[in-house]
Amino acid sequence: MHHDPNPFDEGNADDNPFSNGGGGGGGGGSRQQYGFRPTEPAGFGAGRGDATVDVPLDTMGDSKSKARELSSWETDLKRREADIKRREEALRNAGVPMEDKNWPPFFPIIHHDIANEIPANLQKLQYLAFASWLGIVLCLSWNFIAVIVCWIKEGDSKLFFLATIYALLGIPLSYLIWYRPLYRAMRTNSAFSFGWFFLCYLIHIGFCIIAAIAPPIVFHGKSLTGILAAIDTFSEHVIIGIFYFVGFALFCLETLLSIGVLQRVYMYFRGNK
């Protein structure tokens, strides 16, 4: 009867791969060298059959839906951008000026480009009128500061309320009712714009004269830094009086500058009529 050899029989050192007999580490040529590779960790592809990862179908569906939405938004944005460019091009072809906000440079809120939109012979006069508008902005801003100092010292809330109204209404209204019409008149030579400017600018000059005087019968107490309010305040509080005298000087300078602008614009309008 044939007996199968026992693979675990230590008697046959040549067949036992774990035997160190005889030759130690460097065995003879008759011995077969067995190489070992490190065992692979059990994981994907190990064991009975290959393991699979189940991806929820609803997740895949949501991803596809989001991709479609993003694609739709992108298409819509491109369409709107093309439509805006087409309208701008149509306006340019029709001769309508495109007014992009560019002033002040750090926070553009208005369009202002004297160098490119006003004729060269009128640019100096327009810059002078622009200085007049900046002057009333400075006057009303300083008036607000001076009245705030007086309000803190005396505690009259009406002063604070009126000074706030002067600043919040006076600055934007001065731009809208007389500076912007003059800018338009210089650019288009519109007689109507010139007429509107003259009317509103006379009101502006009248306000500056009254503010420089600050009579208590017109404005409440010390809500304007005119000469009368400055003298009254200086006799009580020197520091506050200095604030008021500075405001008085600013209103005087603004009045003189505005009168000069009015004369020059009127001379140009009469000569160009």
Curated annotation (Swiss-Prot):
Positions of transmembrane segments: 132-152, 159-179, 194-214, 239-259
Coiled coil (UniProt feature): 68-94
GO biological process: protein transport
Cytoplasmic side: 1-131, 260-273
Keywords: Cell membrane, Coiled coil, Cytoplasmic vesicle, Membrane, Transmembrane, Transmembrane helix, Transport
GO cellular component, one term: transport vesicle membrane
Subcellular location: Cell membrane; Cytoplasmic vesicle, Secretory vesicle membrane
Domain of life: Eukaryota
Stretches the record annotates as Disordered: 1-69
InterPro entries: SCAMP
Gly residues bias spans: 20-30
Record membrane topology: Multi-pass membrane protein
Role description: Probably involved in membrane trafficking.
Family: Belongs to the SCAMP family.
PANTHER family recorded: SECRETORY CARRIER-ASSOCIATED MEMBRANE PROTEIN, SECRETORY CARRIER-ASSOCIATED MEMBRANE PROTEIN SCAMP
The protein, known as: Secretory carrier-associated membrane protein 6
UniProt organism field: Oryza sativa subsp. japonica (Rice)
Gene: SCAMP6
